[in-house]
Amino acid sequence: MNNILQLNPQQKHLDLLEPITGLPTISSSPVKFVNNFGQLITDPKRKVITTTTSDDIINVVKKDFTFENNQPDDIVRLSEATILQSGINLKGTTRHCQISPNGSKMFIQYTIPEHTIDIGNGDETQFQILFYNSYDGTWCFTVRAGAIRMACLNGQVHADDLSMFKSKHTPSINPDHARRKMVEAIKTFEAEGERWSRWKDQSATNRQAFDCFAEAAGCKFVLSSEDMSIYDLLQHKNVYTNRSFMYMWNQYTTHEQKYLGSNEWAIYNALTHWSTHAPAGRKTNVNNELTTTVRRQESVRGAIATRLAA
């Protein structure tokens, strides 16, 4: 397999990437417990999953669960093989890898500047391929298309989710499947660019923005109080204590609306600024911050599907 990849002319671009170091190793051990008689018992049907970076037990699984070819370094190699097999130009590609402190989740993001959309006045968005994997059952191995707006480094959320690949078991991707899915992903990315351009020309009222942020933040009080003014709503405890909603509203009124205008593109960028940059809640476990980001992206997807023009 390595010899095949070395023959790929795009390999030279991946060779320029900084290596990902310090990856944990996943291991397992038998489940043991003390019964009512004080005896130490081994459960023959279960085992616990741990990593070399933490003493945490990150999952309890059936005995036949395997992480053969599913170690974090395997996922990195698979991510490289996948984008090589996809047939796209990888010149200038960058990579970002994030792993939760206890090793239970990992995320790899490739940004591919050879596929860039300019939606006007130099406002550029670059194509991304995202790889997700977890060992605590949060999500299965997933490959998804994404994008990043270069002006603010917001991770763009596609209105139509494009999961290129999912697997609950040992990950592997057929080269033909990778190429086919990449063609679909780039077409979707280009279609999203056309949608974003339309949003720049689609004017929006403050109330439309307010309701869209409430949808993403799960602020039901706003959505059920159409007769109340924005001013009155902002005085209500159910609104001003919703940190996600207030983050988006403040981002919109103090930045996006000021620089982009009162339009759906500005609303969208306030949404993606929240999903990309907003801090996790005070009670959020540090090992669940990656989960929070993905959950926010799904909330944004739902809001734009119901509140912004197609």
Stretch-by-stretch model annotation:
Residues 70-81, 103-107, 126:
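Short, well-structured alpha-helical interface segments that form or flank functional binding sites
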Residues 55, 84-89, 117-125:
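Intrinsically disordered, low-complexity coil segments
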Residues 82-84, 89, 174, 181:
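Generic signature of intrinsically disordered, low-complexity, basic-rich segments
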Residues 58, 83, 146-150:
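Generic hydrophobic segment detector
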Residues 1-34, 97-98, 111-310:
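Intrinsically disordered, low-complexity regions enriched in serine/threonine
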Residues 60-68, 77-80, 94, 98, ...:
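Charge-dense, intrinsically disordered terminal/linker segments
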Residues 1-77, 87:
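Feature for intrinsically disordered/low-complexity regulatory segments and propeptides
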Residues 84-114:
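A short acidic/basic microdomain associated with nuclease active sites
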